[in-house]
Amino acid sequence: MKKFLYLTIAALALVACGDDDHEENNPPQEKQYTKLVTRANMDISQELLNIADITVYYMNEAGEVVNERMTSPVLEKTVTQPIPCKTGMAVTFTVKPDLNPTAEEKFDIKYSGKLTTTPYTKNNDPGAMLNKVFGLDLKGVRGDKLAETLSHHTTKIAYTYTADGKQADTSIQWGF
């Protein structure tokens, strides 16, 4: 009986003394990201849409800057790009050419938006999501200050992504 007990203890000791170095020899692999999904959303007040030409700039699937005019109060865009890449969004506001506001007129400028970026591996495993929220809510902007106010509230968001999923602020030549 003692012999059986000693053999059991010896067997357990051998198992317990196994190679614990396997983690040092095989460090965990960093995830490699292959694509970036960018979602842009904007909500514009009807009053702002009536008084301003609003142009949205963004990076397309090929990494080129494209733009479009907002003609409705809601914008939703989803773009998928290969990583490494640059992504982002810019929004410009200019007073409509046929609008000649006076100092006595008052305008409310209201918009909100969100840019969400998520990197994915080739197996579609998502990495860290980044949300950038922006917007403006100004009440009673005088008509004679409208153009100046709108020009000071251009939105520019730009990021670069690398294959290891790291994101950094960058600059993009938007073309305006």
What do these predicted regions represent?
Residues N26-F176:
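First exposed extracellular module after export/assembly in secreted or surface-exposed proteins
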Residues F4-A40:
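Bacterial Sec-dependent N-terminal signal peptides
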